[in-house]
Regions:
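Short beta-to-alpha transition helix within the HATPase_c
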Residues: 1-9
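ATP phosphate-binding glycine-rich loop and adjacent ATP-lid/helix-beta elements
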Residues: 78-109
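A short beta-strand-to-loop micro-motif at the C-terminal edge of the catalytic HATPase_c
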Residues: 56, 106-112, 120
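Short beta-strand/loop element within the Bergerat-fold HATPase_c
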Residues: 50-60
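Conserved short strand/loop->alpha-helix "switch" segment adjacent to the catalytic nucleotide/phosphoryl-transfer site
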Residues: 10-36
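Glycine-rich nucleotide-binding loop
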Residues: 61, 72, 109-116
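Conserved ATP-binding N-box helix of the HATPase_c
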Residues: 28-50
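Acidic ATP/Mg2+-coordinating residue in the GHKL
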Residues: 68
Length: 135
């Protein structure tokens, strides 16, 4: 997906990972969807020319960061998007919370927006069942 995105939109995307996946299929799909929605939001709203995605795990945590050099995001813009029914960032947040993850929006001198998700590795021990599939 990332290679297709780079080729289609001409946005430089660097992807770094040590995450092997395969321990929890639903979690792996959730990570994919978070990255997919984030890249879609970056294309639609940020004007970024550069994106950096890092997905790494250690003994205790799996951490995903998605950073871009676009126009940035303020709390007011997030609240306005929610009121207008543009819920991309809230969909991402819900996916993170489904796996008891932490969610932060940050920025630094290089990147105007940094989405950070942090999950405890212990939550991967049990396969999350999507109740919507059953019903």
């Amino acid at each position: 997906y990332i290679e297709d995105y780079k080729n289609l939109y001409g946005i430089d995307v660097d992807f770094y990972t040590n995450y092997e996946g395969g321990k929890n299929n639903n979690f792996d799909i959730t990570l994919y969807r978070i990255i997919q929605e984030s890249l879609s939001n970056i294309k639609r709203h940020s004007g970024a020319t550069e994106v950096q995605i890092k997905l790494y795990e250690n003994t205790d945590y799996i951490i995903l960061t998605i950073a871009d050099n676009g126009i940035g995001l303020t709390k007011e813009q997030v609240e306005l998007a929610k009121k207008q029914g543009r819920l991309g960032i809230y969909g991402i947040q819900e996916r993170i919370f489904d796996f008891s993850g932490e969610f932060k929006l940050l920025k630094n001198n290089k990147y105007s927006t940094i989405l950070m998700c942090k999950f405890k590795t212990e939550m991967l021990k049990e396969e999350k069942i999507d109740e919507n599939i059953i019903n």
